[in-house]
């Protein structure tokens, strides 16, 4: 298998091979985020199970799903964008296409949320930063979680996109035999950053649902510069695969490592469950799945159905909290028996998938087809050596 990977590394930096399994995995990550939010009894308060054991089991099952799902998206973003970076692309064209990819769905769900829940009561100090995708930079939970909560991660993505062309220049300069060292340094940097926040930022009073203060939660989870480690790790793992330095970890061990990381995250100090406990398994899984695609091996995530689900996963991610809030308001504090509650959770999940599909076919795909194609020029090449 190493020979297959090394053969692929002889290709130029613009790597035309698609990675359909990673598209399919995006849906799994979005489903984990849905399960996490649906299981909450506080903040969102959707968890509809009257039976305490069923409610607790639901919450424990998805207790790390939100943190892991978002971390997966950040690592995946760095990996995929590095993998597909074109040497004839321009910085402006790249950033324009990336903004075009995320902003229309953001605006649509922002407007829907404001119309349904907040137009009359949400002040401009909350809705305007959210609209402009700068709210994750503001250390107030009513701001960084305001309007449509999941949109905070788009602030991080936007920050990553702006930095990517410049990061790529330096990451491409790293000698092949030092890529693993830099990947390890990135993980150590993430751990050191979280440790410093844990030591230097007050931990009380706690937020409503978790044992962490607003300030510490903001810095350790929402603040875009401190999520850059995950994005850069994804970039480095892509370079490791492209240069033939991947260790050849198989899919089964990679998934086993991910499950172990998920369980491990349940027992580490709360703040370290956000990304420190799971970022290495996530990076290894993404690279292992990508390597399988390059080698032409089956993964179970590259089929037509999984790719369709992956295509709509961004829209699903953006609209699922709107669906959960609507159902929570309809429940109005009522709890249901286990069969009825399970049906309701599945119905909300189905509605989120449907909403994601509508966003994809009505907004995301038409916009990208109309304006999202690269317009390469022979100057200002992205990632060019300087």
For the regions a protein language model found, what residue spans apply to each?
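Aromatic-enriched alpha-helical transmembrane segments of multi-pass intramembrane proteins
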Residues: 23, 32, 66, 129-155, ...
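Membrane-interface junctions at the ends of membrane-embedded or membrane-associated helices
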Residues: 87-93, 170-177, 239-251, 291-308, ...
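Transmembrane alpha-helical segments and their boundary/interface "anchor" motifs
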Residues: 22-25, 29, 63, 67-70, ...
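Alpha-helical transmembrane segments and their membrane-interface exit regions
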Residues: 281-291
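C-terminal "closing" transmembrane helix and its immediate cytosolic amphipathic cap
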Residues: 1-14, 171, 299, 303-306, ...
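Perimembrane loop-to-helix junctions flanking transmembrane segments
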Residues: 48-60, 210-212
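N-terminal membrane topogenic signal
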Residues: 14-27, 178
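Alpha-helical transmembrane segments of multi-pass membrane proteins
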Residues: 33-45, 194-195
């Amino acid at each position: 298998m190493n020979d297959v990977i090394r053969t692929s590394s002889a290709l130029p930096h613009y790597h035309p091979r698609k990675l359909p399994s990673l598209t399919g995995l995006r849906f799994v990550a979005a489903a984990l985020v849905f399960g996490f939010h649906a299981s909450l009894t506080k903040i969102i308060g959707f968890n509809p199970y009257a039976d305490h054991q069923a409610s607790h089991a639901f919450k424990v099952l998805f207790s790390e799903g939100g943190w892991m799902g978002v971390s997966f998206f950040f690592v995946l973003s760095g990996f995929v964008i590095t993998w597909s970076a074109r040497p004839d692309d321009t910085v402006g064209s790249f950033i324009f296409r990336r903004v075009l990819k995320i902003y229309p769905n953001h605006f649509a769900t922002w407007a829907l949320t404001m119309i349904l829940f907040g137009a009359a009561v949400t002040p401009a100090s909350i809705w305007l930063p959210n609209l402009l995708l700068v709210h994750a930079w503001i250390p107030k939970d009513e701001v960084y979680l305001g309007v449509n909560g999941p949109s905070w991660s788009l602030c991080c993505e936007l920050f990553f996109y702006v930095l990517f062309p410049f990061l790529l220049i330096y990451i491409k300069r790293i000698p092949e035999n030092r890529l693993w060292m830099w990947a390890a340094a990135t993980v150590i940097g993430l751990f050191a950053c979280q440790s410093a926040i844990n030591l230097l930022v007050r931990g009380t009073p706690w937020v409503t649902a978790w044992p962490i203060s607003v300030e510490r939660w903001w810095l350790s989870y929402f603040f875009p510069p401190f999520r850059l480690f995950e994005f850069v790790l994804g970039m480095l793992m892509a370079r490791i695969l492209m240069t033939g330095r991947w260790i050849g970890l198989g899919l089964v061990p990679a998934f086993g490592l991910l499950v172990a990381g998920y369980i491990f995250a349940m027992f580490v100090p709360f703040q370290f469950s956000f990304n420190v406990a799971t970022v290495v398994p996530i990076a290894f899984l993404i690279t292992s799945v990508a390597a399988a695609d390059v080698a032409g091996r089956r993964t179970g995530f590259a089929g037509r159905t999984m790719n369709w689900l992956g295509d709509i996963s961004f829209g699903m991610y953006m609209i699922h909290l709107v669906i959960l809030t609507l159902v929570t308001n309809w429940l109005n504090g009522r709890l249901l028996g286990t069969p009825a509650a399970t049906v309701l959770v599945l119905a909300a999940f189905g509605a989120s998938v449907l909403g994601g599909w509508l966003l994809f076919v009505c907004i995301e795909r038409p916009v990208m087809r109309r304006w999202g194609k690269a317009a390469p020029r022979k100057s200002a090449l992205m990632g060019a050596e300087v």
